[in-house]
């Protein structure tokens, strides 16, 4: 599911799905241009943080009662997790996979389709702009200035390049609202692990 500016009380939705018997639940914040009426705004952040806290506490309670469920944004592996490369560079857009349009054009991912500066090639000619692939290959938590001091950088891998581009005009930028929410989700995930380890 997706929550927006118009339904910030998403913890109720998640818990309702759990009450219906779903064990694997994903409800994510919408990412939209700030001109959209449903876009998450900076002033929504405090309520979203409270919702994450409410959800985390209820998940701990339910797990202890034998009625636990997974909320994907709180899943964290503190002992293993992705390989170092994935922790540094994220999803692999533009390097490990491409979006192929119905007319055969290559873009780093589906969110770049139509952004002509990121047209990498096509099915007839292959990759015609390897410099784009190189640009994405160099995009990681060490090249993103806003990631350098962030405690969550190895859990989000620098965030989404498309969101960075659409909000900052640069794939090495960041989507600050997304960063704030990611830090809170990591905090809640660690809190859940700690609370359940104490029993």
Each model region followed by its residue ranges:
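Radical SAM enzyme [4Fe-4S]-AdoMet core and its adjacent flexible, acidic
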Residues: 1-97, 114-119
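Flexible mid-to-C-terminal extensions adjoining Fe-S/redox cofactors in radical SAM and related proteins
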Residues: 113-199
